[in-house]
Amino acid sequence: MHEQVYCLAISKDGIKWTRPKLGLVEFEGSKDNNIILTEKDPVLGYICHNFSPFLDVNPKVSAEARYKAVGGGPLFPLVSADGIQWKKATEKPIITKGAFDSQNLAFWDSVRSEYRAYHREFRNGRDIMTETSDSFTSSWTKPVFLEYTPDRGGELYTNQIMPYERAPHIFIGFPTRYEDRGLTPSTRHLPQWKYRQKRRALSLREGTDVTEGHFMSS
């Protein structure tokens, strides 16, 4: 396996995608690729595993910080003018409570005029926490777990939460539900069982777990 990398793909319609040749990062002897960041980067390499950029629609956003993200573990604020060249906005982490080796995302809430972030933490299994800030680079509130009606319905891994474009006062989410019952009589009937056995040799749960997409709103 090669090191983790973060790549850029471009689309005009969200259906057909292209991989621009950026010439930024050497990979297997060539810079003829669409990589913007690799985990070997001495400054930002640690964010490759959990990096989820967003376009900041805050009307007061500066040109050099049009794109933002939270990444690392604990989470640091990152900014970019073009979504390609990134830098840390501060040397101090902004969110420290959580399990950050998964999707960590943030966005500008135009209705409440604040930034909101979502990340994973454990509460009877994997769950989702949220916090807010009016500045992005500091003053984040204490994270709290989401509340569900009627209930969570199992462990939730990634969250994919965002404002609904046509009604930004409504948030929608597409979380990944995670389930692992271990090795049972039915496990061998899961898809790609031979491949799962190979993964299980390195990580037991990766040979037996299953996931599915959910939809939720608030």
Language-model-derived ranges and their functions:
Residues 1-157, 163-218:
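Beta-rich carbohydrate-recognition and catalytic domains
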